[in-house]
Design a protein with these regions (language model features):
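Helix-biased "structured C-terminal domain" signature
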Residues: 1-478
Length: 478
């Protein structure tokens, strides 16, 4: 049910994409171009902008949202399955409120009221879970995050006295008990007690808690920073023992009513191909990334690099020089991994899977014989290396030592090659020396192309996508 909109000659937004309300949000200054909305997966500029139909909640009208806009701003926020559409919508809206209210609390450094002990005692299972955490040495604070009964949101915050770190977990649901239970279970979801040693320390630095990247960290795994003000004894709201519960239909109506009271419009897509599921977008409320990213940090920047990077082994010297120059001029963070940059899934246990922009530029400079530029990046790699492939670290240690000799006027590689080989091994030194003299190109990177040879992980994704399309076509009688 996707619809494609051809690009216009002047690159303005094509008619039929978005509505007036959303255009005001996503294109307030008229700077958003059609080319900004080419989807990253297909990269099909000739076909245009891939868009998905959503139903506007207020009047049932269909509005087309570019898939690029959704992937750039909303990530997975507001998606859920359920036994029926009403139940799925309750879960979608609960998730949206959880994250939006959490963001508001963290960014505005709002002080929440504690949940009274007599209220907590109504839920012995939850109290037992809290006591279990405290017995492990983690003080727990339970707070009402409804902002005076406005929203169905709770918060359970864990402190780690061993590290000084704090982990604030939020949960949302029309039922007070379910929201509280979700807040508690979220604390340890996907992490062990040892994992709680990595949670960040609170701060009085308002800039640190309010920057957009901090919210992204909270969205991904709740490891963003929160303010010390969060723990003030002077709370900004009184405790409310709220209750929005009812039938699925009643809960859905209540949650949509909250959005309406905020002046927000919701857009809904329902899916029944593999069970009952839906997605809800609430523009200017449920985005994870800032709207400016559509212009300044769009994922479709991958289209500027994908083909050249996948064809790396077949590029001429001029093409390599052009590629590395474009990477430098892009001012992209050196530590962005290539998986993220070009939108291709590699096996994470391979060199491709852990390759960053920094290492790619380093290998290109070696291939071009620019040893000084390569040396600078080798030093950066060794200083900030997160690569878990041990052999890769040793390769660059050996490369650093060998480049120091190669770039010196006083040293000769023949005087050191024996010792280097004893230290790093024959295979590694053959790769290092070969990379420096041009006999070895892009050491560790297996050759591939736009046909994705050898990239089984991405090919499996494509195969799954084809199966889904086949099933949907069969269901539609096509």
């Amino acid at each position: 049910n996707e619809k494609w909109f051809a690009l216009t000659d002047d690159d303005s937004l094509p008619e039929g994409i978005l509505d007036d309300y959303t255009r005001e949000i996503y294109n307030p200054e008229g700077e958003l171009c059609g080319s900004h909305l080419i989807d990253t997966n297909s990269g099909n500029k000739e076909r245009g902008i891939c868009s998905i139909p959503y139903v506007r909640h207020s009047d049932g009208e269909t509005v087309y949202f570019p898939s690029n806009l959704i992937e750039n701003l909303f990530l997975s926020n507001g998606m859920s399955a359920g036994n029926n559409f009403a139940e799925a919508k309750v879960q979608c809206l609960s998730e949206i409120f959880e994250r939006a209210v959490k963001r508001q609390i963290i960014e505005q450094e709002i002080v929440l009221p504690d949940v009274p002990e007599d209220v907590l005692n109504k839920y012995p299972g939850i109290v037992a879970g809290i006591n279990g955490l405290e017995e492990q040495g983690f003080p727990v604070v339970v707070k009402d995050a409804s902002l005076g009964g406005q929203f169905p949101v709770m918060c359970v915050t864990l402190m780690n006295p061993k590290t000084g770190g704090v982990f604030a977990s939020f949960g949302a649901h029309p039922s007070f008990e379910v929201a509280l239970e979700r807040s508690l279970t979220e604390l340890l979801q996907g992490r062990s007690f040892e994992g709680l040693n990595d949670v960040p320390k609170p701060t009085f630095n308002s800039m640190a808690v309010s920057e957009p990247e901090n919210f992204v960290e909270h969205f991904i795994d709740s490891t963003g920073v929160i303010s010390w003000r969060f723990f003030s004894a002077k709370h900004d709201y009184d405790f409310v023992e709220w209750d929005f519960s009812g039938s699925n239909e009643e809960e859905t109506a209540s949650l949509f009513g909250i959005l309406e009271s905020l002046g927000k419009e919701a857009y809904i897509a329902e899916f029944s191909d593999l069970g009952t599921a839906c997605r809800i977008l609430v523009p200017d409320y449920s985005e994870v990334y800032p709207v400016e990213d559509l212009i300044w940090d769009n994922t479709n920047k991958a289209l500027n690099f994908r083909e050249d990077i996948l064809n790396l082994h077949r590029l001429s010297e001029d093409q390599l020089a052009d590629l590395v120059e474009r990477l430098e001029q892009s001012e992209l963070d050196n530590y962005i991994d290539i998986i993220t940059l070009i939108g291709i899934e590699f096996d994470e246990n391979t060199v491709w899977g852990q390759l960053t922009i920094l290492e790619l530029k380093l290998l290109i400079y070696l291939a071009l014989g620019d040893l000084e530029a390569a040396m600078e990046l080798v030093e950066a790699f060794l200083q900030y290396n997160d690569n878990t492939i041990v052999e890769r670290g040793l390769f660059y240690q050996a490369m650093h030592a060998t480049l120091e000799v190669a770039l010196s006027d006083d040293l000769e590689i023949e005087d050191y090659i024996h010792s280097f080989t004893r230290m790093f091994g024959q295979e590694t030194m053959d790769a290092v020396v070969g990379s420096i003299n041009g006999d070895v190109m892009f050491y560790g990177l297996t050759e591939t192309s736009m046909k994705l040879e050898g990239l089984d992980r991405h090919l499996r994704l494509i195969e799954s996508y084809k199966k889904l399309h086949t099933a949907r076509a069969k269901k539609a009688g096509l």
